[in-house]
UniProtKB/Swiss-Prot annotation:
Known catalytic reactions: 2 D-alanine + ATP = D-alanyl-D-alanine + ADP + phosphate + H(+)
EC number: 6.3.2.4
Annotated localization: Cytoplasm
Function: Cell wall formation.
Naturally occurring in which organism (per UniProt): Erythrobacter litoralis (strain HTCC2594)
GO biological process terms on file: cell wall organization; peptidoglycan biosynthetic process; regulation of cell shape
GO molecular-function term, one example from the UniProt record: D-alanine-D-alanine ligase activity
Binding-site positions, ATP: 131-188
The ATP-grasp domain, residue ranges: 105-305
Protein name, UniProt field: D-alanine--D-alanine ligase
Residues bound to Mg(2+) 2: E272, N274
Note on how the cofactor is bound: Binds 2 magnesium or manganese ions per subunit.
Binding residues for Mg(2+) 1: D256, E272
Length: 323
């Protein structure tokens, strides 16, 4: 596909979140794709003066290439709603819910989507006792890209209970989500334009699909399509579409899973749905789009077109909805 007119697009990237460097890579990839298609691009590195910079640029649309706070948690979405500027990806309410892993569970689990159990814990309490039986996972409530994730096992060198001086997310975050560790395989499915594209299996060479494994070339093998039974592929696509719909995502999203293949269908669990998935050359959404026959440039333009269509369908300047 190709947009029927040339646009002025602000690509919003960077910022101050842990995922700044990833966002810069995503944003630059998007900007080059748009320029290749003849669009005018203004690159803006997110800072406290971003509203004034966007107003001065006066774009047709903003491509939100930010990851993490404040570009993924509803802050930027609310600002752009108030400014009356069309923007890509999900809206304010969806972003607020999806970045919070506990709020996401409250939306998805009652509607039949399986997610790991667990609970919110105070980091200070970890130095007294484990919140769950080992092995378990500790992760920030409001971060993506496996930032700050720790797997606590009997063999880990964190101590038992965890030592105060042991390096881990408890040193950076006051609150963490503790979940049982699910043995098995890492799977993911992207949704673009209401279609679940494929299922990819991620095989990190480090043994865990962490931040470095995600964004360092050669650290993770991507198997697309995944070598999994047809019924698991169908379930992954079904859950990705349902999560996209229930949360009110738009444009694109990516749902991540752990699958204990010894448990069959019962071993598949949704970990999270990402409303701002990466758009770097290593990223999973472009990879699955290519598998589905969509070029990188077509993918970027499709996301922009979805944003413009949504904005045109709105009534008023601030939709305030989850779509």
């Amino acid at each position: 596909m190709s947009l029927d007119r040339k646009l002025h697009v602000v690509v919003l990237m960077g910022g101050w979140a842990n995922e700044r460097e990833v966002s810069l890579m995503s944003g630059e990839g998007v900007a080059k794709a748009l320029e290749k298609r003849g669009h005018t691009v203004t690159r803006i590195d997110m800072d406290r003066q971003v509203a004034a910079k966007i107003a001065e640029a006066a774009p047709d649309v903003v491509f939100n290439a930010l990851h993490g706070v404040p570009g993924e948690d509803g802050t930027v979405q609310g600002m752009l709603d108030l400014m009356g500027v069309p923007y890509t990806h999900s809206g304010l309410a969806t972003s607020v819910i999806a970045i919070d892993k506990e709020l996401t569970k409250q939306q998805l689990v009652p509607r039949g989507i399986p997610m790991p159990g667990g609970r919110i814990v105070q980091s200070e309490d970890l130095y007294q006792q484990d919140p769950l039986a080992r092995p378990y996972v500790l992760k920030p409530v409001n971060e993506g890209s496996s930032v700050g994730v720790a797997i606590v096992t009997d063999e880990s060198n964190y101590g038992n209970p965890i030592r105060r001086d042991a390096p881990g997310p408890w040193q950076e975050f006051r609150e963490l989500l503790a979940e049982p560790f699910i043995r098995g395989r890492e799977l993911t499915t992207a949704v673009v334009g209401g279609q679940a594209l494929a299922v990819t299996e991620l095989k990190p060479k480090s043994g865990f699909y962490d931040f470095d494994a995600k964004y360092t070339d050669g650290m993770t093998e991507h198997v697309c399509p995944a070598d999994i039974p047809p019924e698991i592929e169908a379930l992954c696509k079904k859950y990705a579409l349902e999560a996209h719909r229930i949360l009110g995502c738009r444009g694109t999203s990516r749902t991540d899973y752990r699958w204990d293949d010894e448990q069959g269908d019962d071993g598949l669990f949704v970990l999270e749905t990402n409303t701002q998935p990466g758009m770097t050359p290593l990223s999973l959404v472009p990879e699955q789009a290519a598998y589905a026959g969509m070029s990188y440039e077509d993918l970027v333009e499709a996301i922009v077109e979805a944003a413009l269509e949504h904005f045109a369908a709105k009534t008023g300047g601030n939709d305030g909805d989850q779509g």
